Amino acid sequence: MLDRPILRAITPHDLPAAAELLSKALPYDHTEPVVEEKLLGSNHRRDRFTTGAFSPSGELLGVVALAGRWLKLLAVHPSAQRRGIGTILLQSARAHLTASTGALSKLRVGDHPGNYLSPGVDERSLDAQAFFRARGFVEVVRVLNLRAPVHRNPLVTPERLRKLTSVARADGYTVRRATLADAEPLHQMITGSFAPVWSFEVARALGPSLRSDATECASELPEGPAVHVALDGTGAIVAFAAHDGNNRGLGWFGPMGTLEQHRGHGLGEALLIGCLLDVADRPDGGVIAWVGPVGFYSRASGAVPDRRFVVFEEQ
């Protein structure tokens, strides 16, 4: 490349240029609504490294976002690709990781728990895959997003939600939307029985007042808290499902969980359908990200494979 880019931290002032860059560099993602969340938003581990590569005239050419050892995103404007900018940004992320955690830490691409744009490199992004392979990264796993039809789907209707809720009630359970008062019981239940990072996402889904970064996604969602819960006869929360805890505003579903001793009562289905009805009109409404139980989602909502991703890690 002729001129080495100037590297500096991304600031709120840079977000419009970053949104334009990401929309062109990452064609398979809806990036504009979540650019602030991805670049300046909080992470589960409370750390953040977000750097831009700028031309001498101040044009944003590329951006890298790192959280811990996870490379959340690396993007270069198409007009500036194949000039070494991506490599420079990757090297800056590597240097930051080495300085902060030690040389033995390995960069991992995409699947950052809690705040991720996508859980890996889209399988269709062949150039991106080649870029990482050429720089010593190897494939470690492939992951899947599903998408449930949210319109004209007999499995996703208010009538079906009422039926599922009624069945749960007959078994002694109450299914409802969560409130801010549920925040601490949810945190205790999730951290005690599921992945602690899920509590971070659920807190974000409950509402801006529970997020540590006051500038991030400051507006409430139209439906209110984006979490649905099931309570047993004692009033204890025994199941939950959330959406918009990650990629807020796009309508991504997850996480969800039911305590083992309360499974088999249709609670998960009721909570899933409640969430899918919430997100019917979002840009990515119906996306079920980073899926484990494919069969459950297929049976409960008619979800089908949508996108596949490759997760890379340094050798």
Task: Indicate residue ranges for each PLM-predicted region.
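A structural microfeature
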Residues: 62, 141-144, 238-239, 307
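Short amphipathic alpha-helix that is part of the acyltransferase structural core
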Residues: 1-38, 52-54, 59-60, 143, ...
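Conserved acetyl-CoA-binding loop-helix of GNAT-fold acetyltransferases
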Residues: 82-98, 258, 264-277, 299
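Conserved hydrophobic beta-strand within the GNAT/NAT acetyltransferase core sheet
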Residues: 71, 106-110, 119, 253, ...
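Short hairpin/turn module used for nucleic-acid contact or packing/dimerization
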Residues: 263-315
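A short, internal acetyl-CoA/4′-phosphopantetheine-binding micro-motif in the GNAT/acyltransferase core
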Residues: 70-83, 112-115, 256-264
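Acyl-donor-binding surface of acyltransferase catalytic domains
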Residues: 1, 90-169, 310-315
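A conserved beta-strand-loop-helix scaffold within acyl/acetyltransferase catalytic domains
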Residues: 23, 29-50, 62-70, 194-258
